[in-house]
């Protein structure tokens, strides 16, 4: 029970396909690091981004999201405008065990540049790519490097099974692929 180690993460990813693709070692020379670490896994950001813009002139409404609020971008380096925001997704696809919750925290390399990464918890039973929220809090444009590390995931095993997993309740983001915009169940 509790916070899971590198050996547990490796075993679950190799044997149970918890993380696909899975980097068994920490990769860190010449890149923002990614792969397994002592008590976590550093995820990579893909090369597709949705950058928020004010060109459409609409209001951001999570209950009725207008796709005119974002511009699609694909490339090795994404420039997030000053005081702006982008969405991306992980390269990795997750298959969460029914008794494990994952929490994701931004990497210090980006945080020290004013880049804040937010990802909501990966609930027990969740399957899919992870949509990543990236905020540039600086007055300057900021680079995000595709196919490199963006955040660290910590895995926490519950003391007892939960009554209902994300899969059981057919969560609205279950089995998401690509960047998923806000959804409201109707």
Swiss-Prot record:
DCTP binds at residues 107-112, 152, 166, 176. Its EC number is 3.5.4.13. Keywords: Hydrolase, Nucleotide metabolism, Nucleotide-binding. GO terms for molecular function: dCTP deaminase activity; nucleotide binding. Pfam families: DCD (PF22769). The keyword Hydrolase applies. It comes from the Bacteria. The keyword Metal-binding does not apply. It catalyses: dCTP + H2O + H(+) = dUTP + NH4(+). One of its GO terms (biological process) is dUMP biosynthetic process. The active site is at residue 133. Pathway: Pyrimidine metabolism; dUMP biosynthesis; dUMP from dCTP (dUTP route): step 1/2. Catalyzes the deamination of dCTP to dUTP. Belongs to the dCTP deaminase family. Homotrimer. This is dCTP deaminase. It comes from Campylobacter concisus (strain 13826).
């Amino acid at each position: 029970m509790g916070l899971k180690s590198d050996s547990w993460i490796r075993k679950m990813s190799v044997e149970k396909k918890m993380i696909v693709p899975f980097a068994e070692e920490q990769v860190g020379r010449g890149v923002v690091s990614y792969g397994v670490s002592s008590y976590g896994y550093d995820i990579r950001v893909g090369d597709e981004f949705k950058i928020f813009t004010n060109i459409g002139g609409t209001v951001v409404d999570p209950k009725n999201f207008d796709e005119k609020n974002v511009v699609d971008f694909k490339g090795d380096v994404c420039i997030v405008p000053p005081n702006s925001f982008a969405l991306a997704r992980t390269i990795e696809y997750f298959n969460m065990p029914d008794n494990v919750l994952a929490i994701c925290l931004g990497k210090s390399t980006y945080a020290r540049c004013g880049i804040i990464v937010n990802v909501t918890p990966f609930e027990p039973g969740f399957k899919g790519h992870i949509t990543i929220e990236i905020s540039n809090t600086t007055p300057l444009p900021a680079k995000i490097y595709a196919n490199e590390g963006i955040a660290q995931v910590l895995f926490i095993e519950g003391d007892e099974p939960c009554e209902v997993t994300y899969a059981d309740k057919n969560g609205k983001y279950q089995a998401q692929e690509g960047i998923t915009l806000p959804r409201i169940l109707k």
